[in-house]
């Protein structure tokens, strides 16, 4: 049982959606390109309230970083959706080292991301 727990990590992050409302994509493209890959930006911009989507994806990325023991950057983490469920893709060799369970919730003021990472 202890071995199983040692292979697990958990990360959680909450963010105010207003941080992304104040930094509109059209005026702050470089800021967004330092955090999100192109597919994530395109996904978020499809929604009327893209700030909630950006905040949710940011919270997920922060939660991933907190859930694993290795150094990783924002652009090494891609959040994708399979149906309505968020999934994680890692851009480097870490992808084969972890499985993730992800949950995200966002509403008018806050977004929260929770990640459980299993080291394989």
Describe the role of every protein-language-model region.
Residues 2-120:
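Core catalytic alpha/beta fold that binds nucleotide/phospho-ligands
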């Amino acid at each position: 049982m202890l071995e199983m727990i040692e292979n697990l990590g958990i990360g959680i992050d909450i963010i105010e959606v207003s941080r992304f409302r104040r930094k509109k994509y059209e005026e702050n493209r470089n800021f967004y390109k330092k955090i999100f890959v192109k597919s994530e930006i395109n996904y978020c911009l499809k929604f009327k309230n893209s700030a909630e989507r950006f905040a949710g994806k940011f919270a997920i990325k922060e939660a991933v970083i907190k859930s694993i023991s290795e150094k990783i950057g924002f652009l090494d983490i891609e959040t994708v959706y399979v149906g309505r469920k968020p999934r994680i893709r890692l851009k480097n060799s870490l992808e084969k080292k972890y499985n993730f369970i992800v949950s995200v919730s966002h509403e008018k003021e806050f977004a929260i991301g929770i990640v459980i990472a299993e080291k394989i």
